[in-house]
Amino acid sequence: EGHPEVVTNIEGTKASPEFLQAIAYEVYVKNVTFGLLHQWLTDMGMTISKNTLRNWLKKGKTYLDELVCVLKSIALEKDSIVNCDETWCKVRKYDHYKKCYIWVLVNKAQKTAIFFYENGSRGRDVLTDFLGDAELKSIMSDGYNAYVFIGNELKSGRFKDTVHQVCMSHAKNKFVKASNQGGEPTAERFSEILKEFFMRDRKYDDAGLTPKERFQERQSLETKELLIELRSLLDSEQSKDSEFRSRYYREALNYLNRFWKEIFAYLDDGELPIDNNLAERTIRKLTTQRNNSLHYGSDAGAEMAATYHSVIGTVKLHGSSIWNFIGTFFKNIF
């Protein structure tokens, strides 16, 4: 009593847990660039370099990496249902900025989001390296990742029991674009039928159906009739001369045909999702940062962002306060 409060510094730095909490929140939640953050701190009278700020966040990353390792093992538990997506970012390599990619994998049931980065690549090795020997029930992606990933890896013995899904929203949006921009009248009917699948699943959500009940509805006569109508329309359109069709319509038809099995795999299981919106919403934060001209000065900077966003994304899925979690974490590691 009567003594000043003891300020604990993070080992190897002069930063307190509270200060690290503040700069991490500014950079990775509020999307403030290092340059603006540095300017703000110097305007307040602090003598600090941008490199020092990065080094402090790097120190915080070493502790968060241990947490992310645990979260990853939870996200990839046996028979998990996961969604994945990627987005591009700018990373400085060899004195210039290069377009690179950060990925995210989300496990809805476990409320876990893991961001990962492997030298900025968008290739199949990034995903397969991340998955390791995980025995997943299903993995959902968009069409590009399906093209790159499903071609070999998911058809191999390594992932033979994993159901690969492709997002239905992407298929529907392609037909909407073909109708609005390509002027293709039949494209509207495709989008209407695909929309009906979404409406049905939304009704199941509103009714609070169990996976077993949802499976029964997905296998109903009405659903099968809708599927037959869509397939008949697709076969009919593909049999016609495509010379005078818009490229948007050709792309939509080819997409639906190529990924038909993966798009409608959800009908065979009451637990599987219909789209990849969960992963897309989770990674949208990085898209916002990119639009704010955020860039990473190195691969290490992108890897650090992946660590912080893994924690932030997971906390958001739990509906908890990011500010409070980060602060409590850094205060309790000492």
Language-model regions, residue ranges each:
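Catalytic center-proximal scaffold of phosphoryl-transfer enzymes
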Residues: 2-334
